[in-house]
Amino acid sequence: MSKRDYYEVLGVSKGASADEIKKGFRKKAKELHPDRNADNPDAEAQFKEANEAYDVLKDPERKAAYDRYGHAAFENGMGGGGGGRAGGHPGGDFSSAFSDVFDDLFGDFMGGGGGRAGARQRATRGADLRYNLRLSLEEAFAGLHKTINVPTSVSCTSCEGTGAEGGAEPTTCPTCSGMGKVRAQQGFFTVERTCPTCSGLGQMIKNPCKTCNGHGRVEKDRSLSVNIPAGVETGTRIRLAGEGEAGLRGGPPGDLYIFIEVARHELFEREGNNLHCRVPVSMAKAALGGAIEVPTIDGGRGRVQIPEGSQSGRQMRLRGKGMPALRGGGTGDMFIELAVETPVNLTPRQKEILKEFDEISEENTNPETRSFFSSVKSFWDGMKG
């Protein structure tokens, strides 16, 4: 039976790059793996075919020969780049073809790395940590230095992070020679498993540290001084490199990320770098106009001139009285929104004065009222017609 085209076998085009060829083989290898095809009697042959195709196409010289001569390149001793394979046969060494994707492939099946992973697992980077920090709006405005206590894992001082009693260096695992994985031949397939002796670490500790039980780190609360810049807002993230969890067995530490939450303020509402403040004013002040004092976020006072006849909702701006920009570039503004307050709990004299005021008011005294009821009258007249 004639052989299928190698590119077709891997599901890639003839112009595929080396990376695309590798991805194609990895996909096929996962599809045809025996753990997933126990009921498919053809899976082994198809897997062998994919391995043979990848063995050729991953090698630039052998790929060039195949592109020029096809399968004939490896018949009758052709295919000069065969390098030690009898007759230049492309499928002679399963392990060599598979080794460069073994880590990724079996990591999916067994939850770990491949045969070279053990060396990396000896020293593992510590996890990144998150710390939520709640600030007042005043603190966010001014910035501050704040001391926080972070529960984390720190390097064990008893063993200097090695996990071994007295700080002794771990020894290489004799079973896997430090690789963290062992290989077993199962018929046609070579399967990698986590080393049972060292549990995939590639190392052994004869006398584990009694303080950290061989982990090289211990749980502890750390006190850190953090610089919070002026202008932070809810969602701002501050990264402290190397202040996260300590690494395993001498590995580098992770990072600490501080997430800022700014509490709501009783007077000010923030919108970007601008602040809004709703200020109640008396009916008389709104009608007659005049100056009022308003609070500012820095603890000071701002002076605002209210025009005569101001209505609720009118806004006035105090420039430069908002929040500082986090990365420089000036300061926001503060917007004053007037809320005209209708008087309550009136004395008899006050009621008398208001009645007199209403009686002597002219049509143009309350233009909005006049305009509204004029529209209402037109509406009713239209309904009658």
Swiss-Prot record:
Q: Gene3D superfamilies this protein is in?
A: DnaJ domain (1.10.287.110), Heat shock protein DnaJ, cysteine-rich domain (2.10.230.10), Urease metallochaperone UreE, N-terminal domain (2.60.260.20)
Free-text comment on the cofactor? Binds 2 Zn(2+) ions per monomer.
Q: Name one GO biological process term.
A: chaperone cofactor-dependent protein refolding
Instruction: Identify the residues that bind Zn(2+) 2.
Output: 173, 176, 195, 198
**Does the record bear Chaperone in its keywords?**
yes
SMART domains on file: DnaJ
- GO function terms (MF aspect): ATP binding; heat shock protein binding; unfolded protein binding; zinc ion binding
Q: Which residues form the J domain?
A: 5-70
First-listed, main subcellular location of the protein, grouped into a coarse class? cytoplasm
* Ranges: CXXCXGXG motif repeats: 156-163, 173-180, 195-202, 209-216
| Cofactor(s) needed | Zn(2+)
The source's superkingdom equals Bacteria
Give the UniProt subcellular location, in the record's own words. Answer: Cytoplasm
Q: Which residues bind Zn(2+) 1?
A: 156, 159, 209, 212
One GO cellular-component annotation of the UniProt record comes to: cytoplasm
ZnF (CR-type) residues: 143-221
Q: Which InterPro entries does this entry report, sorted A to Z?
A: DnaJ, DnaJ_C, DnaJ_domain, DnaJ_domain_CS, HSP40/DnaJ_pept-bd, HSP_DnaJ_Cys-rich_dom, HSP_DnaJ_Cys-rich_dom_sf, J_dom_sf
Record's keyword terms, sorted = Chaperone, Cytoplasm, DNA replication, Metal-binding, Repeat, Stress response, Zinc, Zinc-finger
**Domain remark text:** The J domain is necessary and sufficient to stimulate DnaK ATPase activity. Zinc center 1 plays an important role in the autonomous, DnaK-independent chaperone activity of DnaJ. Zinc center 2 is essential for interaction with DnaK and for DnaJ activity.
Task: Tell me the function of this protein.
Answer: Participates actively in the response to hyperosmotic and heat shock by preventing the aggregation of stress-denatured proteins and by disaggregating proteins, also in an autonomous, DnaK-independent fashion. Unfolded proteins bind initially to DnaJ; upon interaction with the DnaJ-bound protein, DnaK hydrolyzes its bound ATP, resulting in the formation of a stable complex. GrpE releases ADP from DnaK; ATP binding to DnaK triggers the release of the substrate protein, thus completing the reaction cycle.
Entry's HAMAP family?
Answer: DnaJ
Q: Which family does it belong to?
A: Belongs to the DnaJ family.
Subunit details: Homodimer.
Output this protein's name: Chaperone protein DnaJ
Organism whose genome encodes this protein: Ruegeria sp. (strain TM1040) (Silicibacter sp.)
Q: Its encoding gene is what? A: dnaJ
